[in-house]
A protein has these predicted regions:
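Anionic-ligand-binding alpha/beta catalytic cores of soluble enzymes and soluble regulatory domains
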Residues: 25, 30-74, 78
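Generic anion/oxyanion-binding catalytic loop in active/binding sites
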Residues: 1, 26, 38, 85, ...
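Long, positively charged amphipathic alpha-helical accessory segments at protein N-termini or as interdomain linkers
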Residues: 10, 14-19, 56, 100-101, ...
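A short, charged helix-loop
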Residues: 14-25, 32
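Single conserved hydrophobic/aromatic residue that forms the stacking wall/gate
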Residues: 1-8, 12-13
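Phosphate/ribose-recognition catalytic cores of enzymes acting on nucleotide-derived substrates
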Residues: 65-179
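Short, conserved beta-strand edge motifs with alternating hydrophobic and charged residues
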Residues: 22, 52, 60-62, 97, ...
Length: 179
């Protein structure tokens, strides 16, 4: 049986519990806390967030059918919508790893409102998976945010968006050391 007691409390003294005081863990000379993690998440320091969490920050959801624009641009995406209560990093593009049915895939993810193609305020997570061509609508997926690439941008036209997705994909492929 494991018990705990407040240091110096009557229960500790009466039951002769042994109290061990453990120093707080630190990372980069700062005490690890939920506040520290939220601060780092708020500014998109994903590498630090992932170290502090001891796992990658993730968004989980069921794949929904989008407007199919990514497919028309030769960058088909899987789209999920985080709950309104999910604390998220800044809107932007991230190098990500996505798990579908236990299998992992690398890709790039836009977290945000898609300002080039939509005026809607709804936040979505749109992920282009490298070397992937499966129908996963209705499946639960887990998107792990590994590295912040750049802030979300509004492009003058979809051709500019397409060029930037290609550049973001090249960056992420190089980062993940895949062709």
């Amino acid at each position: 049986e494991i018990s705990a007691c407040l240091v110096g409390s009557e229960m500790c003294i009466r039951d002769r519990f042994t109290t061990i005081i453990v120093e707080k863990e630190k990372y980069q000379d700062k005490e690890i806390s939920s506040t520290y993690i939220r601060e780092e998440l708020k500014v998109g320091h994903m590498e630090t967030v992932n170290v502090l969490l001891n796992r990658p920050f993730n968004v989980t959801g069921v794949v929904s059918i989008g407007n199919q624009l990514g497919r028309k641009l030769d960058f088909p995406t899987i789209n999920i919508y985080p709950t309104e209560y999910k604390l998220l990093p800044p809107n932007g593009v991230y190098a990500t790893q996505t798990t579908i049915d236990g299998e992992k895939f690398y890709g790039v993810t836009n977290l945000g409102t898609k300002p080039t193609v939509s005026d809607a305020p709804e936040i979505s997570v749109e992920t282009f998976l490298f070397d992937f061509d499966k129908d996963v609508y209705g499946k639960k997926v887990d998107v792990e945010f590994i590295h912040f690439i750049r802030p979300e941008m509004k492009f003058e036209d979809v051709e500019g968006l397409k060029r930037q997705i290609a550049a973001d994909s090249d960056f992420a492929r190089n980062m993940f050391l895949i062709g």
